[in-house]
């Protein structure tokens, strides 16, 4: 006697098979991660891979649909990490790490504050000396603007900045006077600080002696003790060249 299966059973079986096949196609358990790219400032890539549990030849199904969870796991592993972002594109995984950065220190009413990468200030006893001291700032928004650009700089450049002083004059109401750890002095402008300070390493490398790097209008340098007229002439020449 031939058994006749109910229509509902066939429909349920078809749905189950469809879901199973769909899951297999989505997870592709036979696929593996081919490459892992880690973007971080100072934390070694090997550490980040270990925190994430992702390496070349890791099964793709361990990553697919779990990138947010993996990112949270990375942050919990290391106090130096501010945020993490994990992106999967086929067999390639990219992990972007934003490390916690001490953007500097500022003193107000004899109280010291540490400034984080978001410009938030927190009371401390005394600066640790691992980031620049901000002085002369009266507008908190100006501090945040400078901080937002400072934290984007290369680590070696950040480590070379000792002090960032708000030092306006009649020619530049937003002038910054920056003291470098290598012995040079930099003049810059709040609005263009982040973009122009990146030129500093190349300019400093060509200076025959310690001196001033002026990034307010163009970019030029002169040695300490050089007549200010020479510096002014160079600045004027630079402006004229830019207008050509």
UniProtKB/Swiss-Prot annotation:
Residues 1-6 are cytoplasmic. Signal peptide: none annotated. GO terms for cellular component: cell division site; plasma membrane. The chain crosses the membrane at residues 7-27. It is found in: Cell membrane. Residues 28-244 are extracellular. It comes from the Bacteria. One of its GO terms (biological process) is FtsZ-dependent cytokinesis. Its main location: membrane. The keyword RNA-binding does not apply. It is a single-pass type II membrane protein. Belongs to the FtsQ/DivIB family. DivIB subfamily. This is Cell division protein DivIB. It comes from Leuconostoc kimchii (strain IMSNU 11154 / KCTC 2386 / IH25).
